[in-house]
Amino acid sequence: MKINPTFFVIMLVSLSALSAATSKPNVVFLLSDDQGWMDYGFMDHPHIKTPHLDKLANAGLLYERGYVTAPLCRPSLASLVTGLYPHQTDIRGNDPVMPKGAKPTSKNPGDIQLWTKMRHKMTAPMLSHPSFVKTLKSNGYATLQTGKWWEGNPVDHGFTDAMTHGDPTRGGRHGDEGLLIGRKTMQPIVDFVDRAQKKDQPFFIWYGVFLPHSPHDAPDRLYENYKDIAPNESTARYWANVEWFDETCGEIVAHLKKKGLYDNTIFVYTCDNGWLPKPDRVGKPIRSKREPTEMGIRTPIFVTHAKTIQARREPKILASNIDIATTILNVCGITPPKTMSGLDLREPKELEKRNKVFVDVYEHDSDLEQLNNLDHGLKARVVIRGWDKLVSTPTGKELYQLKSDPDDQHNLSDKNQNLVQQLSVMLDSWLETTPPLR
């Protein structure tokens, strides 16, 4: 039987096209650390330069009114991974409450042993929770952790590759060696991408860089851009760190373009919590991080993909970082676990229908013996519906109208008790429908 060679050529071309059409997208998750929601070029900041993020944001679907589930890094990051709220994960604070007199930084062997035991206990809940990273790995993705990570060894949580070791006996807490990414090197990302490409394997990158987080020590060439236009040194140094973060994002994009991978890569961006620099103290916040204020809980969120996502800017619709796990799995063609209550960020009409977001605000340190008590260590719970914002604290309730008062400065609770009651009912219902997963 004589077979026409042209037939083989046609078949190879067809199979190649089919493979390209059905190939899984790569995902790069850009996660900044301690950044104010206005502090980007694409959010119209008059001075801060973020050209690389601007290009990504303007090419994708951008939600100007994104919110975190907690204005503190560890619980916020846990929500990103699990698609659950802090009161569901038992991941509410950064560190455990230590017995009186014991110090985690002590060189005393007893203190070191106690600290290690408590950190292991503190990070244990994450092992039993759903995780979009675990799900990606089980669906054939190579997964890289860089930067901040609080939950012990990332390899135990679905990462095939990790910079962080997470061992408290070796100084592991919130990222250890991983915190070198961006500030000292980008090579682990370059090497990971190159390995995945050689294996023809789809990949996910967790870029949890320790920027613009303090220390605000960006290179002098960046500080020079702001020292004469910022209102004070604290702000100038923070702004320089923001630009530094943007530069590192540009390096990732450039490498993906160099390797021909950019068009098949989805970019997702958010920040872990907000930041407003204290004017008289470098590296310290005011009325932002760890607080239920807009400068503490608001962040832009965007999803960008050259192939499938049309450029669009949403100035009104509410988005939450609880939506990110669901979105990443959906864009990869994977059904999210049923416990994830977030929506797909690519469906703005669904987010518009929801029209509300919720936030847990707990103390920095958690008493590990009191995790069954959802009110222990509670500073506030927040619901935002449309432009109305209720902050419920153990001592009272505050009501803000964010359209006319975007910095939540004017408490209107005394003037509109009916609205306070409506939003309070929504908070109660939220807690009832999102119980802890233990």
PLM regions: where:
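Long, internal low-complexity/basic segments
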Residues: 22-25, 32, 62, 94-95, ...
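A short aromatic-rich beta-strand->coil structural motif
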Residues: 27-28, 33, 136, 148, ...
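Active-site segment of extracytoplasmic enzymes that catalyze sulfate/phosphate-ester chemistry
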Residues: 29, 37-130, 141, 154-168
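Active-site His/acidic residue clusters
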Residues: 189-238, 273-286, 418
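C-terminal cap/loop subdomain of S1 sulfatases and analogous C-terminal strand-loop tails that border
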Residues: 275-280, 287-289, 309-310, 317, ...
